């Protein structure tokens, strides 16, 4: 009981102290912590503190904090929180292709899960269920494709192209696949390769 009280007191006063610090000092501490893979919980805590003081940060810093917080959430098995923070990062820096790539892979996991449901419903020969599961699958694929397209336009690789091709084919979107090169060409003109915070 005493240990719990002491821990709660430490966390409360520690949080109060961080909130009283100059924002530059808190941001520097965050930058240091996020480099240490063994301090994920501390990184989450200080990143949330920074986001609570978002009016004191510039847009580049907000993009950076959200991006790295999303990465920590993805690494610690919280994909929904990761998606939310990657999307928040895109609001501040919409052309950073690494964020698009990360979101693409998080959504791809959902596509894979929904794709299995489509396959299972087809095996059951349940037409209504198959239509329902395919509709949900297609919605998720349609969310996923733009992230991979931006990533592929900015940093082309065979794996991403194969994923895109597979997603288009799995939803029988031949027109989307045929016009993919045109979209990639248009998207590659605006790529951010480094998430700067200054």
Give the ranges of each region predicted by the language model.
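N-terminal leader/linker segments that initiate helical-solenoid repeat arrays
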Residues: 18-63, 198
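Short coil/turn linking the two alpha-helices of tandem helical-hairpin repeats
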Residues: 37, 71-77, 104, 109-119, ...
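Residue-level recognition of tetratricopeptide repeat
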Residues: 62, 96, 157-158, 191
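TPR alpha-solenoid repeat register
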Residues: 65, 99, 160-161
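Short coil/linker segments at helix-helix boundaries
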Residues: 108-147
